[in-house]
Amino acid sequence: MAAAALEPWSAVAPRRRKRAAGRRPRPGEGPRAEPEADGEAVLRRLREAEEDLRISDFCSSALETITECLRKQLEQLQPLTEALGRLHLGSSLPSASQEPLASSASHVKCVCYGLGTFASCPTARIQLAFMLLFLEKCQVPRSHCWVYDPLFSQTEVSVLTSLGVTVLSENEEGKRSVQGQPTVFYMPHCGTALYNNLLWSNWSADALSRVLIIGNSFRGLEERLLARILQENYPYIAKVSDRIAGPGF
């Protein structure tokens, strides 16, 4: 299993700033979230966020890191694929060095949890734009991408559908099995329980070898939580935190 930690991003949920002494909020004033716009306006803002990310050094570096993680994962899986191919087909398959990432990535799935309300939250919109750029960079078809957030509005569901990704209708609570397919789980700042559920659902050497997580640092979770709490409430994270392979950015 590989993981890339998105430490620089803040949580999607807007935080309240401390008000200056004696200052009263103006009528209608709230968190930094924007009023939700119509679908066309949301798409326009999303395209603007994509363009901003394209010229960002952070985005470029992060995409290169993720691409390299995915390439290494697919290369490690290739010997098993070759062995199975020989068993069933009686002939060898192209080696990892012969097969480009784009060809291998066409078999990769992407599952996104916890994106946030991107129609009104700029941070969530940036996270969605980054996911779309990741799919483009690694040439993972959008039809191989599933997304879910319990807070999605109907406008956001319509926008995501128009982008070519599938919006899940049920809350899986992170309990999705990779079912033998390399799968990237894009989980920008999800709760610790979802990561634990994901590991539980794929708790075998074969399944974990096909999991790549873009999200919070497991080592960071380990440092922030008491060992007893981690062991009792999130045992699968505790088991892999010192064995996981993957950089932060």
UniProtKB/Swiss-Prot annotation:
InterPro entries given in the database record: SRR1-like, SRR1L
Compartments, record wording: Cytoplasm
Basic residues bias (residue ranges): 14-25
Alphabetical GO biological process terms: heme biosynthetic process; regulation of circadian rhythm; regulation of heme biosynthetic process; rhythmic process
Keyword hit for Cytoplasm: yes
Major localization listed first in the record, in broad terms: cytoplasm
Induction field: Up-regulated by hemin and 5-aminolevulinic acid.
GO cellular component: cytoplasm
Ranges that cross the membrane: none
Comp. bias intervals (Basic and acidic residues): 26-40
Family designation: Belongs to the SRR1 family.
Task performed by this protein: Plays a role in the regulation of heme biosynthesis and in the regulation of the expression of core clock genes.
Protein name: SRR1-like protein
Organism the protein comes from: Mus musculus (Mouse)
Gene: Srrd
